[in-house]
């Protein structure tokens, strides 16, 4: 399935200008039909999955309790 720049921006939650700049720089593969750029949707699947996995990992690390230090001495 192919998406326009506007649809791709909505799908990836990025701005249209940023998507267009990535297309023009060749960082996103796209087909130009003479009127608009068409971007293959599946090329983002792996990237978005990895991004979600990374977010979950960061959240897991942030939710992990800080262990008490066994070397702490009571100085009373």
Swiss-Prot record:
One of its GO terms (molecular function) is DNA binding. NCBIfam families: excise. This is Uncharacterized protein YoeD. The lineage of its organism: Bacteria, Bacillati, Bacillota, Bacilli, Bacillales.
């Amino acid at each position: 399935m192919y998406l326009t720049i506007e649809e791709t921006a909505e799908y990836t939650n990025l701005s249209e200008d940023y998507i267009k700049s990535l297309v023009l720089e060749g960082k996103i593969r796209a087909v130009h039909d003479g009127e608009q750029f068409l971007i293959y949707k599946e090329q983002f699947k792996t990237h978005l999955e990895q991004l979600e996995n990374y977010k979950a990992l960061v959240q897991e690390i942030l939710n992990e309790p800080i262990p008490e230090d066994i070397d702490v001495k009571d100085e009373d």
